[in-house]
C-alpha cells in the first residue's frame, strides 16, 4: 500500500490571489533497452527543456509570477538531473514548484538518489530498503519524478517519487514487464499561504480494490485533513505520457473523486486537478502509433461552472 507522507514547506503564496501554472507539453522519444525504456535523443531533449527553463527565468508576461511548472513523465535525461536542479536553485524565483519526470533508472540508483537527498526523503528510504532486502530487485526499472521546490527563503528542496501503480500489461510503455511500484507520495502543506497540494505520476483513478488505488487514499487523507483543520486538498498535479482519450470509465471515476457519484468527500471538493501530458508527437520504437497524445486537462468540481443566464444585457 502506498504511504502518504505529509511535508511542511515554506511558500509565501498571496492568500486570495490566483496562482499561475505552466504545463510544458514536449514530445517523448523512447526506445526499449533491457527491461526498461530510455530516451532516444537525450541531448535534443535537454535543449528543449533548457529553452523552457530559460523562458521561465526571463519571466516575460505571466511567467514573471509563475508558481508551478510541469514537465511530462520520463521527460528529463537522467544525465542532466544535476544540471536541472542547479538551474532551478540558482535562477528560478522563490516560491516556485517544478514537477518533472525523469528517464527511468534502476532501483539501486533511485535508492541512491533518495539517500543523496535524505533531508527531504528520509521517510521514504525505509520502504525501499525493505523491498531490496526482500529479493533481488536492484535492477528493476523505476519510473520516477522530482518535485523541486524553491522556498520563499531561496532554499531548494528536492522530493523524489516513483510511479505507484505500474502493473504488467496495464500501460503501453510497460506492457512487457512489471516496474517497481513506488511506496510513497508527498502531501505538501505550504505555509504561511495555507495551500495544500499533491504531485505524482499518473493518478491511479481506477478502483481496483479498496486498498490499492491511490485515489482512495488521497480522498481519505484529504478528508481527515478537512475534519481536523477545516482545510482540504487545493490542487493535484499529475504528470503523464498517456494516450487520449482514455477509457470512458475514467471519466466516471474522476467524477466520483469529486463526490458526484459516491459519498461526499469534502477534503477534495475544491481540488483543482491538472493533468500535464506530453505533446502529440511521442514515438516509441517498436510500437505502432495507434493513439492520440498531446491532450492535457484541468478538472474542477462541477459546482464551479458558470451557470447559463439570460439577462437583458447579454
Predicted regions and their residues:
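N-terminal, active-site-proximal structural segment of metallo-dependent hydrolase catalytic domains
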Residues: 1-69, 73-78
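Active-site catalytic loop in hydrolytic enzyme cores
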Residues: 2-7, 114-230, 234
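A general structural motif
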Residues: 16-18, 63-66, 95, 194, ...
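Active-site-proximal beta-strand elements of phosphoester/diester hydrolases
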Residues: 18-40, 158-163, 195-206, 237-239
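Eukaryotic short linear interaction motifs
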Residues: 29-32, 78-79, 106-108, 168, ...
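Cys-nucleophile CN-hydrolase/nitrilase-fold catalytic domain and related Cys-dependent amidase chemistry
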Residues: 47-161, 242-244, 255-259, 263-267
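CN hydrolase (nitrilase-like) catalytic-core segments centered on the catalytic cysteine
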Residues: 89, 93-100, 205-314
Amino acid at each position: 500500500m502506498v504511504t502518504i507522507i505529509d511535508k511542511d514547506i515554506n511558500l509565501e503564496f498571496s492568500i486570495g490571489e490566483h496562482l499561475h501554472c505552466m504545463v510544458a507539453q514536449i514530445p517523448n522519444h523512447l526506445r526499449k533497452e533491457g527491461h526498461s525504456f530510455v530516451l532516444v535523443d537525450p541531448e535534443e531533449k535537454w535543449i528543449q527543456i533548457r529553452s523552457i527553463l530559460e523562458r521561465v527565468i526571463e519571466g516575460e508576461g505571466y511567467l514573471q509570477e509563475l508558481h508551478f511548472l510541469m514537465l511530462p513523465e520520463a521527460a528529463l535525461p537522467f544525465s542532466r538531473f544535476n544540471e536541472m536542479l542547479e538551474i532551478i536553485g540558482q535562477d528560478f524565483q522563490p516560491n516556485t514548484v517544478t514537477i518533472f519526470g525523469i528517464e527511468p533508472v534502476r532501483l539501486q540508483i533511485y535508492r541512491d538518489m533518495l539517500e543523496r537527498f535524505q533531508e527531504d526523503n528520509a521517510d521514504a528510504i525505509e520502504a525501499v530498503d525493505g523491498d531490496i532486502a526482500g529479493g533481488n530487485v536492484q535492477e528493476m526499472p523505476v519510473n520516477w519524478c522530482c518535485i523541486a521546490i524553491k522556498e520563499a527563503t531561496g532554499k531548494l528542496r528536492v522530493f523524489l517519487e516513483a510511479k505507484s501503480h505500474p502493473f504488467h500489461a496495464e500501460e503501453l510503455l510497460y506492457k512487457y514487464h512489471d516496474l517497481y511500484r513506488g511506496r510513497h507520495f508527498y502531501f505538501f502543506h505550504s505555509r504561511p499561504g495555507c495551500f495544500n497540494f499533491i504531485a505524482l505520476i499518473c493518478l491511479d483513478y481506477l478502483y481496483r480494490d479498496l486498498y490499492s488505488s491511490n485515489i482512495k487514499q488521497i480522498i481519505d487523507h484529504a478528508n481527515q485533513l478537512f475534519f481536523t483543520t477545516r482545510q482540504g486538498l487545493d490542487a493535484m498535479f499529475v504528470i503523464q505520457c498517456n494516450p487520449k482519450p482514455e477509457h470512458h470509465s475514467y471519466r466516471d471515476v474522476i467524477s466520483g473523486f469529486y463526490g458526484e457519484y459516491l459519498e461526499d468527500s469534502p477534503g477534495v471538493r475544491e481540488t483543482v486537478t491538472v493533468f500535464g501530458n506530453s505533446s502529440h508527437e511521442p514515438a516509441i520504437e517498436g510500437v505502432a502509433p495507434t493513439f492520440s497524445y498531446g491532450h492535457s486537462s484541468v478538472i474542477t468540481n462541477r459546482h464551479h461552472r458558470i451557470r447559463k443566464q439570460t439577462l437583458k444585457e447579454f
